[in-house]
Design a protein with these regions (language model features):
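Acidic, glycine-enriched loop/beta-strand segments at the rims
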Residues: 9-17, 318-323, 332-364, 370-371
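Active-site-adjacent C-terminal substructures of enzyme catalytic domains
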Residues: 172, 193-326, 333-337, 351-357
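Divalent metal-binding pocket/active-site signature
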Residues: 118-120, 125-221
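Charged helix-capping and loop-helix junction motifs
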Residues: 58-61, 92-95, 218-223
């Protein structure tokens, strides 16, 4: 057993000593005054990592993913499905529901599963990216799939991504806005259409500046509409590849506490370079990038929240803003209370140094070694 002492949070609060299970029969103390305690990170857009993919529909793999993510400093996540056909969506939903149920009886370290996110299949084929175009559906079919999944697994779905310029999209927003977080993604929407989406109940932008119309001086597109919608959130992949660091600084300046950092990681995260499957499509992971197709288009990422935190701080973004975008804001979007620094019998918190490098992780009262392959 390990007793952690002299713990201070990023807002200067002194946190009572914490006892953590370090796997040892001996009792020891560790002075944490050289580090800052921050809440566990929450990844609200992640397909997989460590060789596991939620879209495979395997409950054992979802559980293995949940047990592995604390090494990235993640205490909660929203498993995200690729664009799949109905049978595979329902199979994957069942696997996530089973994983949630089975983890309730597990006493070790794991990242809590917040529900399920559907990235598709109601997306624009012009901006489908690595999403399988053969599985895209119209609005009526999308509603049928949602309703069937809701009937079989009530309350599991928490978030859906749609392209609001497609026929029937606004009806979907009206129908589901009180049930799910609805995010604009993989879309050819212009400013006016995106503004209507936000005005009618949509409240989020999926991986900003990727798989959508660009933000131009006379055509501000979805990003401009999100800026003008004060209750909306903007998620961004901060791997230094999907969005340039200067643009990241701009986004944090413009959107302030509305920024949500996501990984959009696929199964190659935390794994060696190689060829990996993503929603039925072969993707090459090489040198921290993921590619697919003859044009070498980006296909998700292999980053993780601990890498993103350190990277954003190195770009000049204030530490408190980085931490909030990784902890409080993604939970707020899903209406989840952040209790990670409130103590309790099974605390979850990260210890970071002055560069936001992850140094120690406490996951549900267990000491976890950080994954530091940067």
């Amino acid at each position: 057993m390990l007793r952690l002492t002299n713990i201070r949070s990023s807002d200067g609060r002194i946190i009572p000593d914490i006892e953590a299970d370090d796997g040892s029969d001996n009792y020891s103390e560790r002075d944490m005054s050289a580090f800052t305690a921050v809440p566990g990170y929450f990844d609200s857009h992640i397909h997989g990592s460590f060789g596991f993919d939620v879209s495979d529909g395997n409950a054992d793999d979802v559980i293995r993913l949940a047990k592995s993510l604390p090494s990235f400093g993640v205490s909660g996540f929203l498993p995200t499905l690729m664009t799949l056909d109905e049978d595979h969506i329902l199979k994957a939903a069942g696997a996530v529901a089973e994983a949630i149920s089975r983890l309730k009886d597990f006493d070790g370290a794991y990242a809590e599963i917040a529900g399920l996110r559907l990235e598709g299949p109601f997306l624009n084929p012009l901006f489908s990216g690595v999403q399988n175009p053969d599985c895209l559906v119209d609005s009526d079919r999308f509603v049928e799939i949602i309703e069937k999944a809701e009937k079989e697994y009530p309350g599991l779905i928490k978030m859906i991504d749609i392209a609001p310029e497609l026929d029937g999209a606004m009806d979907i927003v009206s129908k589901f806005k009180d049930r799910y977080v609805i995010s604009l993604g993989h879309s050819d929407s212009d400013y006016e259409n995106a503004a209507e989406f936000f005005a009618n109940g949509g409240n989020s932008l999926t991986h900003a500046l990727n798989a959508m119309r660009p933000c131009l001086k006379r055509e501000p597109g979805p990003l401009g509409a999100a800026f003008d919608a004060p209750d909306s959130y903007v998620e961004v992949i901060c791997d230094g590849i999907h969005v340039d660091q200067s643009m990241l600084r701009m986004l944090f300046k413009l959107f302030e506490d509305r920024v949500i950092v996501v990984s959009d990681a696929m199964r190659a995260g935390g794994m060696p370079d190689g060829i990996y499957d993503l929603g039925g499509i072969d993707v090459e992971s090489r040198g921290g990038r993921t590619y697919f197709g003859p044009g070498g288009n980006l296909a998700g990422s292999v980053t993780n929240p601990s890498q993103e935190a350190e990277r954003l701080f190195s770009y000049g973004i204030p530490a408190n803003q980085v931490i909030k975008a990784l902890t409080d804001t993604p939970r707020k979007r899903l209406n989840i209370e952040n209790k990670d620094l409130s103590g309790g019998a099974k605390p979850c918190l990260n210890f970071v140094d002055d560069t936001l490098r992850l140094k120690s992780v406490i996951s549900r009262g267990r000491l976890v070694s950080p994954y530091l392959m940067l």
